[in-house]
Structures are given as structure tokens and as C-alpha cells.
Amino acid sequence: DLNKVFPPEVAVFEPSEAEISHTQKATLVCLATGFFPDHVELSWWVNGKEVHSGVSTDPQPLKEQPALNDSRYCLSSRLRVSATFWQNPRNHFRCQVQFYGLSENDEWTQDRAKPVTQIVSAEAWGRADCGFTSVSYQQGVLSATILYEILLGKATLYAVLVSALVLMAMVKRKDF
């Protein structure tokens, strides 16, 4: 029944900071949901080229509501890359889902609409690592504090020196 044909909605979820900091890896997750029938092909594209390395896709779509005969389906896939590759803002990641509204065995005529075939995708760009962690922040604050104290000490020493020179000049004037 063509009235029950629903194309997928596709979303890409970015890797967690915890995963990146603990494993030096980044896993992007693609989720295709709400489609019926379950005829889809999912692929990952990085910088305009299809990739297979680091990809793990569910073996088949799952029913969102298994109790219903005409339940819509969902499918997930993961792409794992190095943390440094993910942290390059020039890298472009795209999850593409090709959806076939009818199977190859279904026939269609002029009285029946052509098979629904769509490409639905979602994307993400690499995120630059701003370099701030709690440790680097604390080190930066400590360095700034030490630098401030050095500059303050230097300014105080300069003020004492100038005051001493002014005082000596005033004493010499009184002697004349």
C-alpha cells in the first residue's frame, strides 16, 4: 500500500568529549528512523568520498514498534575515526540513506505510482579542539598568576628606584 510509504528521517550524532579524551577515537552515530517499508541502504561519506573503513551498521532495520505489523523501521550505523581526524574542522562527514519505497519484486503500472526512491542524508563537520581541558586551564591560570606577580614586583621595584632617585635629587638641591 503506497499510502504507508514513509521515507526516513536521518540524524548524525557527534562523538562525546569523554570518548575523545579517554580513547583518542571519535565515533559518529547515524540514525535513520520512521521509514516504511524497510528497503534502505546506508553509507558514510567523508570529504565527498564513500568510506567503508571504521563503519559498523546494524545488519538489518529494526521495527520501532515490534507489536505492529506495519510498524515503521529504524537503522543505526557508526563511523569511528581518530580524534585528530575528527578535530579537523575541514573534514566533512555525511551519513546517506537511500530509500526504496517498493521492493524490486513489486510491480507498478500507469495506474500505480512509480516506486519512491529518495536519498536522505545528514552531516557534521569536524570540530576543532579548542585546547582547553581542566588541567590546561589550571596551568594557564597558574602561569598567568606567576606572570602577574612578576610584573607587579617589577613595577614596585621600578617605583622604589624612581622614588630613591627623586629623593636623592631633592637632597642634592638642598645642599646647594
Curated annotation (Swiss-Prot):
CDD domains: IgC1_TCR_beta (cd05769). Residues 171-176 are cytoplasmic. The chain crosses the membrane at residues 150-170. Glycans are attached at N69. Residues 8-117 form the Ig-like C1-type domain. Keywords: Adaptive immunity, Cell membrane, Disulfide bond, Glycoprotein, Immunity, Immunoglobulin domain, Membrane, Receptor, T cell receptor, Transmembrane, Transmembrane helix. SUPFAM superfamilies: Immunoglobulin. Constant region of T cell receptor (TR) beta chain. Alpha-beta T cell receptors are antigen specific receptors which are essential to the immune response and are present on the cell surface of T lymphocytes. Recognize peptide-major histocompatibility (MH) (pMH) complexes that are displayed by antigen presenting cells (APC), a prerequisite for efficient T cell adaptive immunity against pathogens. PANTHER family: TAPASIN. This is T cell receptor beta constant 1.
